[in-house]
A protein has these predicted regions:
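NAD-dependent ADP-ribosyltransferases
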Residues: 85
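A glycine- and small-residue-enriched flexible loop/hinge signal that marks low-structured segments
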Residues: 3-8, 17-23, 27-62, 68-72, ...
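Acidic/glycine-enriched edge-of-secondary-structure segments
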Residues: 73-76, 93-118
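Active-site-proximal structural segments of metal-dependent nucleotidyl cyclase/transferase enzymes
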Residues: 82
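Membrane-interacting alpha-helical segments
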Residues: 11-12
Length: 300
């Protein structure tokens, strides 16, 4: 039941229309653009030579979207997943640094997994290369892979930050069973995918991880000690549906409660589509509250 997790409330005298919140929570995204070579990316960024696949920081999500959109148009690319990921963050009305670690998607799945693992590892050097270090890291469309999830957990643990992973499952039972492989205060697991109107004007299902990252960043910046608040039970802006129906009956046993009890962050329909979760899978209940984990990270 919701009472098991406390109550979130907000008192506000702000504007009736949403405004962007300035947040000091950088989001790191490991991403690829099918058909984009490292030379294309470096050239677009104004560099003459290309070494390894780049990691770039953008002052806000609008700048990142502009860069990726221009890269797609100028090279006639057809992969809009990164653009949709950035739009998911943008829809949460947050103004924060975005760090993109690019990697090449190969025709061989093994090579792709190696490349994405290297892109996630690159977040450790983000401060040196970009001047910014991520507080949240995601790898949408790939984090359901066991090896990618493991790398996200490893890097998040070494950097004392939070990684958000997307589960692959076709029903509630499968999603819950997947959590047998989780036990970390550094990971938030999300399921199922949610529907948005994507950047191409079509309804599409996308991973929750960038939306949750945007919600956390927004919550952090909403007030002075926002990092001590939970992102749970907040409206997920831009969401128009879920890939699988999630039963939610407030105060009663239901899909949403079973998922949350299994430490899975989900999406419920209750006066809008809302996040429902915020617990890690750590074996010690003290560290199952993500807000507590992140508060100790800030003051340590």
């Amino acid at each position: 039941m919701a009472a098991n997790y406390g109550v979130n409330f907000n008192i506000s005298n702000g504007a009736a229309s949403p405004i962007k919140v300035q947040s000091d929570t950088p989001i790191g995204i490991a991403a690829s653009l099918k058909g984009a070579s490292k030379e294309m990316i470096y050239t677009k960024a104004g560099y003459e030579s290309a070494d390894s696949f780049p990691i770039f920081a953008f002052s806000n999500v609008s700048k990142a979207k502009e860069f990726v959109n221009d890269l797609i148009k100028e090279n006639n690319l057809q992969d809009f997943r990164l653009l949709d990921t950035l739009e998911c963050i943008n829809l949460q009305n947050v103004n924060n640094v975005i760090i993109v670690s690019f990697f090449e998607e190969s025709e061989e799945s093994e090579n792709t997994l190696t490349n994405i693992v290297n892109a996630i590892e690159a977040f450790k050097k983000a401060k040196h290369k970009t001047g910014f270090s991520p507080d949240l890291i995601i790898a949408p469309y790939y984090s359901h892979e066991a090896g990618v999830k493991a790398k996200l957990e490893s890097v998040a643990s070494s950097m004392n930050i939070t990684a958000i992973v997307d589960l692959y499952a076709t029903n509630v039972g499968e999603a819950i069973n997947t959590m047998e492989a989780f036990s970390s205060k550094r990971l938030i697991a999300a399921w199922p995918q949610v529907q948005i109107l994507n950047t191409q004007g079509k309804y599409a299902y996308v991973p929750q991880s960038p939306i949750i990252a945007g919600l956390i960043a927004h919550t952090d910046g909403d007030k002075e000690y926002g990092f001590s608040d939970s992102y749970s039970n907040r409206v997920m802006n831009g969401v128009t549906g879920t890939e699988y129906f999630i039963e939610f009956i407030n105060g009663f046993d239901c899909d949403a409660e079973r998922l949350r009890n299994a430490h899975i962050s989900t999406c419920i329909l209750s006066e809008g589509y809302r996040s429902w979760g915020g617990e890690t899978s750590h074996e010690d209940t003290i560290w199952q509250d993500l807000a507590r984990v992140r508060t100790f990270d800030r003051i340590a």
